[in-house]
Amino acid sequence: MSEQNPTQAAKQAPQQELNDIMAQRLAKLDAMREKGQAFPNDFRRENISDDLHARYDDKTKEELEELAVEVSIAGRMMMRRIMGKASFATIQDMGGRIQLYVTRDKLPESFYNTEFKKWDLGDIIGAKGVLFKTQTNELSIKVSEIRILTKALRPLPDKFHGLSDTEACYRQRYLDLIANDNSRKTFLLRNKIVNAIRQYLNDRDFMEVETPMLQSIPGGAAAKPFETYHNALSLPMYLRIAPELNLKRLVVGGFERVFEINRSFRNEGVSTRHNPEFTMIEFYQAYADYIDLMNLTEEMLRSIAENVLGSSIVNYGDQVFDFGAAFIRMTMKESVLQYNEGIEASELESMASLKALAARFNVNIKENWGEGKVLTEIFEETTEHKLLQPTFITAYPAEVSPLARRNDQDPSVTDRFEFFVGGRELANGFSELNDSQDQAERFMDQVAQKESGDDEAMFYDADYITALEHGLPPTAGEGIGIDRLVMLFTDSHTIRDVLLFPHMRPQAK
């Protein structure tokens, strides 16, 4: 008989321990089945832990005794201390945690020893009782009735010491949410941020709409789409890269203030800031321009910081961002000059000098690029990462802004802005191009770029041109990356930390 490899034995030991634990729990479940319904659904919870803490944490022992507050609560048992005839147990629900005080004498005869003490951490239980304060002044529930509602067959991660394997947190988010308070708080805060954005726009008479995820022509952004096929229509289709063109069709139709919070898809790389499937908000307002939207964005983000985070000062790692101060505003050229030494304004005015500047800063450019694209690439490589405090960058070249309105004083640039914090782009907005002939010409330029090998160039959308020919009122629109905004406001340094189910490579079998 061959000896077992030590490494193999080390790998098998935890699995064997897990198998033993699950076998014990399965036996307990079988015993529950023999006694009746093992998964009851007749317990009704009436209270949530965080609400109880908010209402009664400041009460004294005497006040709680006088109030005699009866509660009904349910959640997952996370900790338990058995002390003879009495036990303390901590349960976790959607609001947080609260302690139960369970005594043998308050329960049916033999229940404490034959039932309660045999339950396991991770089991979901329901309890009723009266609030009181312990000797250490902790708000707790003196239990008069307790039941097991769901038997957990698998143990909690590392016996409740937490789930520290980052990849496991992403692959098994349900375990991460059970074991890690910070993850729970991040996603609860994400929900509050999205609700705050929605409420802000609702209060200003914006209408929330839904537009198709499947499109026959992807548009609204420069990105490579995911391709699919519609069998019933025998039609190649794409997952949308942005909802922009459909939202502007709605403005043509008379819905003058619209927004959508939903997913978009771009078949591009994965990084700490990029996920192929991501959430964004786009909103459009008729009879407004890009300056109006800069003002709205500044006010909205300041409001979210103050009302959701409780402060206009946002801490991100070792950086501090001030959303209470006026946001910085400057043109792309101004920012390149301000944040880079040794560059003269004249160097940004011709193709020859821009190419020389790109070579000096080791910025890679392509021969078919125009001045605007080269300038934008120089900005992105030399300046963007230096925009730390909340900053609007304006005057984007028309060459890189195929859907934006040209500036009246300088038609080579557009009435467009991008918003940066911590060196990262969070938003992109502009006065919309509503000249159908100009838009058709820019679409043709995009088609030429696509034919020359640019996978991210836009398609020609004839129906959108037809919509513009019916008349799009003067309009401004904007898109904000929800995931990146949540990263900033929750001090999260990878996008996977703010996505409940981030994309992962399949595990090797």
Swiss-Prot record:
It catalyses: tRNA(Lys) + L-lysine + ATP = L-lysyl-tRNA(Lys) + AMP + diphosphate. Its main location: cytoplasm. One of its GO terms (cellular component) is cytosol. GO terms for molecular function: ATP binding; lysine-tRNA ligase activity; magnesium ion binding; tRNA binding. Pfam families: tRNA-synt_2 (PF00152), tRNA_anti-codon (PF01336). The keyword Cytoplasm applies. Mg(2+) 2 binds at E425. Residues 1-18 have a biased composition (Polar residues). Binds 3 Mg(2+) ions per subunit. Residues 1-20 are annotated as: Disordered. Mg(2+) 1 binds at E418, E425. Gene3D superfamilies: Bira Bifunctional Protein, Domain 2, Nucleic acid-binding proteins. Keywords: Aminoacyl-tRNA synthetase, ATP-binding, Cytoplasm, Ligase, Magnesium, Metal-binding, Nucleotide-binding, Protein biosynthesis. Its cofactor is Mg(2+). Homodimer. Belongs to the class-II aminoacyl-tRNA synthetase family. HAMAP family: Lys_tRNA_synth_class2. This is Lysine--tRNA ligase. It comes from Psychromonas ingrahamii (strain DSM 17664 / CCUG 51855 / 37). The lineage of its organism: Bacteria, Pseudomonadati, Pseudomonadota, Gammaproteobacteria, Alteromonadales.
